[in-house]
Amino acid sequence: NKPYKEGAYYTGKEHSWDEAFGYWGAAAHSLLLSAEQNYNVAKKKDLASADFNGDGVVDLKSEYVFAHAYYASSFDKGGKTTYLEDITRAFLDGRKLITSANGEKLSDMSRARLMAYVDDISSNWEKVIAESVFKYAGSTYKSLVALEDVSNADLAKEFDKYMKYWGELKGFSMALQVGKNNIGETGAKLNRMVGFGPMLLDCLLYTSDAAD
C-alpha cells in the first residue's frame, strides 16, 4: 500500500500488478482489436493496427503484442476461445480496482473482487499454456515423421524445425508445472513423454553440454 519506492507515484501493489501484465504481453489497446488483429500485430503483419496513437511508430512498451498474449490470440482467432479478451480485461479491471483505493489498504470486499480477477487470469492463462503444449506436441510429432522420409537436401531444414518445435514443447510443458496448481503425476508423465532432451540425427538423446 506504500509507494513502490521513494518518490514513486504508484504503490507496490500497483507495481506488482503492472509487472504481471507486462509478462502477459498484451498491448494497452488490445481490447480494441480483434484476436486476428492482435495476432497479426505480433507477427508484424498489421503494424497499422499496432500504432494506436498514429505517430508512425510502434511503441514496444504499449502498442505491441508479445509473449503469451500472442499465443492466446493465435488460439482465439479461430473463434472458439476468448483467452486474450478475458485475461486482458481482468488485468485492466483489477488495475482500476487497485487504483481506486488511492494507496490505502483494500477493503475485504475489494480484495475479494481482486482475487476473483486473479482467478480469471490464472485459470485462463493456464489454459493458454496447455493449448500451447498440445500445439507443439503435434508439430514435434509431425516433424519427426517428416524426418523419416526427408531427402538429404532438406534434412538440415527439417531438423531445425523439429528442434524449434521440441524446444517450444519443452518450455511450455515446464511452464505448466510451475503455476499455482500442482499438476502432480500429470507433470511427471508429461516430462517422460517429452523427454529431457531432443533426439539427434544419430538417434541419441541430447542431454546437456554442462559436462563438457
What are these regions (language model features)?
Residues 1-208, 212:
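Mature extracytoplasmic or organellar-lumen-exposed domains after removal of signal/transit peptides
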